[in-house]
Every structure is written in C-alpha cells, then in structure tokens.
Amino acid sequence: MKVAMDLFAPFLAPLVGQDYRRLGAMADFIKPMLYRHTYTPAGLFFELDAMARAVSEAAPAAYAARRAYLRQVTGMDGDTGGFFERELAAIPPVGRVVPGIELHTAEGLPPVRRTDIADSVHRVEQAGYFDRVACWDILSADQKAIETFAGIAGRDQD
C-alpha cells in the first residue's frame, strides 16, 4: 500500500501542526497543496484570509487591516508567482515531494485559466519537481486544462 499526505503550503504548515520532515518520513510521498488560483479550502488566499478572520473575531473591524498585513508579510499582496516559488523552495528535503496544482475550482467560482496552470507547471519544474498532482475536482476540469497540466497543450492559450 502507498501512503501519501496532503500538506498545507510550507508557510501554513507549522501553524496547523504539520511538520514536513516528520510527516514526510511516514509517507511514500507528500503533496504540498499550493493552490494559488482558487479561493477554496487549502487555497493560499483562502487560508490566509481565514487566519485574518480568526484573529479578528473579537474585533471584526480589524479584519481588513489584518488581512492586508498578512498578505504583505507573507508576500501574497501582489503577484503570487514569486510567493509560489518561495514556497516551493521552502519545502525541506523529505523524500518524494509531488506538488499539487489546481486545475479546477469550486462551482460558482471563476475557472483556473490554462495560462495559470501552465505557469504553475513551469514553476514547479523550474524548482526541480517533475511530478505533480492534478487537484480540485479533476472530473470537472475541461480537457484543455488537463492537456495543459500534462504538458500537451501550448502555454499561450486560455
């Protein structure tokens, strides 16, 4: 039997008690959930905003300022590409690592664009990871998104 573990992005993992090294030693591979284009659970922006809400429960008016602060200190206040690369680089050597890339998002949310999928695939490969896992309801992803993820379709289409 093979055992794999979904882990939050490296910046979130310590905050939820996930130790990449310890968990990686128990699994055949780990899958960092590096979802930067979808606003769904485990998505980078979704989780960061949830943290801001959690620390603002006693003072809801402070939510917007805390959200902006968390985005600034994590580097997620602009282009997520650089942040994504930093998170890939922050993954400690733990055996087999297979990053998760979202191909689809939840119903009612904007789709993940093929150019974004291609960009994520490119950045994962540039970081030295040549395996990847297609995430977020792959059965609902369109064929072109799957082809882009697999490296079959061009990177310049949407």
PLM region descriptions:
Residues 1-8, 93-99:
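Short beta-strand/loop segments at the ligand-binding rim of alpha/beta enzyme cores
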Residues 2-42:
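Substrate-binding cleft/loops of secretory-pathway carbohydrate-active enzymes
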Residues 19, 59-62, 113, 142:
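Helix N-terminus capping/helix-initiation residues
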Residues 20-23, 48-51, 151-153:
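Short, hinge-like loop/turn segments at secondary-structure boundaries
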Residues 26-45, 70-158:
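Substrate-binding cleft of secreted/luminal carbohydrate-active enzymes
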Residues 45-74:
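A solvent-exposed, charged loop/short amphipathic helix patch at secondary-structure junctions
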